[in-house]
Design a protein with these regions (language model features):
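Domain-exit/linker segments immediately C-terminal to small folded modules
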Residues: 44-126
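Short Lys/Arg-enriched alpha/beta "domain-start" segment
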Residues: 126-127, 132
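Conserved small/polar residues in nucleotide/adenosyl-binding loops
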Residues: 174-175
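Extended, well-ordered protein cores
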Residues: 162-165
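Long, low-hydrophobicity ectodomains and other hydrophilic envelope-associated domains
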Residues: 135-143, 150
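Short amphipathic beta-strand and strand-loop transition segments with alternating hydrophobic
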Residues: 5, 147-154
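N-terminal cysteine/histidine-rich coordination modules
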Residues: 1-72
Length: 176
């Protein structure tokens, strides 16, 4: 845990914000939802009440799923996390995590997708292959349609599926 002194973007006054290098659902089950909603990363200025989302690198450990997700906020942390997750960092006891699912992600959308897949007990590798196949199929059916991203998401109605985005907006939706 680290305590940072930040300047509020609204009132320009200083306040303290606590970051956590790791979130372990085995130690605090409520943290799983706070990470998913973003609440774990919100700092609220005690002077004016302005709430701001702060991004920083952290490890997410879900013991019941044997899953480790490292969110890397910068390139240096990304490289370090890759070394840890692949057993190339001698300071980490590799035997303890060798049989765990280990992923390093570099943006919040990918993190949220991986967490959703954990919740649904789906293999993210299969989902990634399905996204490539969906994109390939789409290119054959609609060659002029350019897709920026394909995400596996849960809709407001609770259904899950693939959302294809074009210019930041959903252009196609395949649900289960």
């Amino acid at each position: 845990m680290a305590i940072l002194t930040l300047t509020c973007p609204a009132c320009q006054k200083l306040f303290s914000f606590t970051t956590h290098p790791a979130f372990d659902t085995g130690e605090d089950a409520s943290i799983a939802e706070k990470v998913r909603t973003g609440e774990a990363f919100v700092g609220t200025c005690p002077h004016c009440g302005h709430a701001e989302h702060y991004s920083y690198s952290f490890l997410y450990k879900e013991r019941e799923s044997h899953a480790l997700l490292y969110y890397a906020d910068n390139e240096e942390d990304f490289r370090k996390a890759c070394a840890i997750m692949t057993g190339r960092d001698p300071s980490v006891p590799w035997a303890g995590i060798a049989d765990w699912s280990r992923r390093v992600v570099a943006n919040r959308q990918v993190l949220l997708e991986k967490l959703l897949l954990l919740d649904l007990h789906l293999d993210d590798r299969v989902i990634e292959i399905m996204k490539v196949l969906a994109h390939s199929f789409l290119q054959k059916q609609k060659p002029g349609l350019l897709v920026d991203a394909i995400w596996f998401e849960r809709g407001a109605d609770g259904r899950t599926g693939y959302c294809l985005y074009q210019n930041g907006k959903i252009c196609l939706l395949y649900t289960s």
